[in-house]
């Protein structure tokens, strides 16, 4: 995938933001330097005789040093975060237009309601729910929506003085749901083992299924109300694709097939695309980002739920 023009535009934007960041960090460094200068003056006799109390000089110097260093890190984090968000939006707009030529809707500030995610039947209700990065598209009768989420659970404890405190356990990730033109009469869950966390639970009255592949069984748990349906959908090739999919992303993977929907959770997702304000953009980063963005579509294609055998009347599925 060659995107030289897009890389040039993004690189020009990076240099512009980096210039502003360096100016802000330079001013912060100057403040810290003033603090160091004040700190050194008593040792070299560079002080007014009116200053009888050296503590005033030291206090002032430490204040300048701490303030300068703090602002260096604050400005670096602020501009880097701003750059990453803007690049993320530009990447998405560029690649989503490439992948979904028939049209799509993307809104960073919007998300999906918890009720949409909860249709998967594997979530515990959180104490707080946050969502953003809403996306929606239709393609050849298939509806595809997604968003980022954070399932937050509160925990309370009392210290030795009797004071009550609250801690928060965050479960961030990405969620996607594909809606197909036809219904599947079974419930199927594929969950990466050691998913952990209190956000997810196992479905009721579903049998655990094991496959011939020992590697797949070690990495994934499969639950279904009909073993025949599970073997029908999760072919050896799908198993290999799921393991590769899991290797390619830093997250805990959960896939659910219910009625006419395919749900995909990428819990605790971390992008492997290392984008920095202070590092030049290159084609490899672009390709990695495009690959991550296309992962849900790749998984849906791998499971091939639109294949002809699902429409054959000889099958009860």
Regions found by a protein language model. Name each.
Residues 46-66:
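Hydrophobic alpha-helical transmembrane segments
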Residues 15-18, 69-95:
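Transmembrane-cytosolic junction motif
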Residues 1-8, 83-104:
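Juxtamembrane membrane-interface segments of multi-pass membrane proteins
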Residues 1-23:
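Cytosolic juxtamembrane N-terminal segments of multi-pass membrane proteins
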Residues 93, 97, 101-102, 108-155, ...:
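Charged, low-complexity intrinsically disordered regions
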